[in-house]
């Protein structure tokens, strides 16, 4: 793990949480290392933390700090070398009619309702399916970096023009875009909204002439997290170094 003294973060303090049940691997406990105080974690500092394996959830900046497990691997896609698979090309074509709008952070009831429906359909019984408005806003609408909402609606040629289908939260950083969270209309089981959102973010990163799309943690043995290795070429932060990660 990257040594904290190597980071230009002398004003920050870091602490380890108490163990808690792992959300991704059964019968495992997890711990996190948290960076504080949050008001000092502006864009430049967060960019350094991101490259050291940290992520943020609202104003909470953390990285895995488990005692006997290194399953969580921070990932980033090499944007200029990305080569879509056949299924990814199909997803891009299928949802090409969606209209994406980039918005400033702000509460919209329509977004919150889609978030609730997504959690109830995709993650029922989890920690987030009962989030109230305050929890939703703390999780997704609080940020001290350059963050945006991307909403995707059915286009004018669709039978339901303007219908909200998906929302993504992204951070615009020095070396790329960091994909924070995406939720979508999970009632359409034939859709590939999640894949499309990643492909859209890749295109935006390329247009900004930035090298990386940060996708969060890859966990090989977790169905919820292993899909990320489908986006190649990808690098993972392993033994303090960014190196090729194929997922095989």
From Swiss-Prot:
Q: Which UniProt keywords apply?
A: Acyltransferase, Cytoplasm, Transferase
> Could you tell me the EC number(s) of this protein?
2.3.2.29
What enzyme class is recorded for this protein? transferase
Q: Which residues cross the membrane?
A: none
Q: Name one GO molecular function term.
A: leucyl-tRNA--protein transferase activity
Q: Which InterPro entries match?
A: Acyl_CoA_acyltransferase (IPR016181), Asp_Glu_LeuTrfase (IPR017138), N-end_Aminoacyl_Trfase (IPR030700), N-end_Aminoacyl_Trfase_C (IPR007472), N-end_Aminoacyl_Trfase_N (IPR007471)
The cysteines covalently paired via disulfide bonds are none
What do the Gene Ontology cellular component annotations say? Answer: cytoplasm
What is the predominant subcellular site recorded for this chain?
A: cytoplasm
The subcellular location is: Cytoplasm
One Pfam entry for this protein is: ATE_N
GO terms for biological process, alphabetical? ubiquitin-dependent protein catabolic process via the N-end rule pathway
Q: Which domain of life is it from?
A: Bacteria
Catalytic activity reads: N-terminal L-glutamyl-[protein] + L-leucyl-tRNA(Leu) = N-terminal L-leucyl-L-glutamyl-[protein] + tRNA(Leu) + H(+); N-terminal L-aspartyl-[protein] + L-leucyl-tRNA(Leu) = N-terminal L-leucyl-L-aspartyl-[protein] + tRNA(Leu) + H(+)
Q: What does this protein do?
A: Functions in the N-end rule pathway of protein degradation where it conjugates Leu from its aminoacyl-tRNA to the N-termini of proteins containing an N-terminal aspartate or glutamate.
To which protein family does this belong?
A: Belongs to the R-transferase family. Bpt subfamily.
- The protein here is known as Aspartate/glutamate leucyltransferase
